[in-house]
């Protein structure tokens, strides 16, 4: 895991504000990733029947009644490193219609064989190029630490995320995710997930201005296909009131 520690140190020097904006990936990272030599495709789709009706910045996509998604292409490099590409990121909203919104590169470092361990840890880095209607800043990034416990049958996972628009450490935005899951079998699980955005480290937003969403999630996993569906409810005025998410994933080739 030494490479991940070096990466964290480098990122904290250059990373730095981000306004509330749309998100294409509603997922808590648990430290697992595809085997070395395997290509994987995860298709993310989200629909917001009742969302925030005002844009996060002038010209931004409006969340209310919008649909967005992205194919996530991943490749297992080693048993502790996975690389990925999100492309194309797309949205359909009531103002712009169908749009293309940018792309992301992802680098995930984790303890080897995380799915088989009781205590898991890792870190994920994302580097985004954004269209002008998707984010107020052209280039943004994410640092996502991963801390978790597989207690069989219960999983507890925490991602204390820091988002940045490269404008100073004090402007790093704290947006943690938490997942508590119960595994009925190796194939089926249910979970509660919380996605939050407290605001910049220099001074969190007031509670009513923070974003907090609570999701109920069902997961199915097999050798051929992984599937996740979730329903999210906003807990504050700044949150989308109702969001639906679907993720479908499968390996595209066999392990060498």
Regions found by a protein language model. Name each.
Residues 1-25, 254-256:
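Cleavable N-terminal export/targeting peptides
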Residues 20-256:
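Transmembrane beta-barrel domains of Gram-negative outer membranes and organellar outer membranes
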């Amino acid at each position: 895991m030494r490479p991940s520690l070096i990466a964290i140190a480098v990122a904290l020097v250059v990373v730095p504000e981000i306004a509330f904006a749309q998100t294409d990936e509603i997922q808590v990272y648990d430290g697992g990733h595809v085997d070395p030599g395997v290509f994987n495709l995860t298709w993310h789709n989200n629909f917001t029947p009742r969302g925030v009706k005002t844009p996060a910045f002038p010209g931004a996509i409006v969340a209310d009644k919008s649909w967005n998604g992205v194919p996530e292409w991943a490749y297992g490099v080693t048993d502790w490193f996975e690389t990925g590409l999100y492309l194309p990121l797309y949205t359909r909203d009531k103002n712009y219609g169908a749009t293309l919104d940018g792309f992301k590169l992802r680098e995930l470092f984790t303890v080897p064989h995380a799915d088989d361990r009781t205590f898991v840890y890792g870190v994920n880095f994302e580097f985004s190029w954004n269209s002008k209607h998707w984010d107020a800043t052209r280039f943004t990034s994410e640092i996502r630490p991963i801390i978790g416990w597989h207690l069989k049958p219960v999983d507890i996972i925490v991602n204390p995320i820091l988002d940045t628009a490269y404008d100073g450490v004090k402007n790093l935005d704290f947006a943690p995710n938490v997942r508590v899951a119960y595994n009925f079998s190796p194939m089926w699980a249910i979970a509660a997930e919380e996605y939050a955005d407290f605001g910049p480290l220099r001074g969190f937003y007031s509670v009513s201005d923070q974003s907090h969403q609570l999701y109920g999630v069902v997961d199915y996993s097999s050798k051929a296909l992984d599937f996740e569906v979730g329903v999210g409810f906003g807990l504050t005025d700044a949150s989308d009131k109702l969001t639906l998410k679907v993720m479908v994933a499968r390996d595209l080739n066999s392990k060498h």
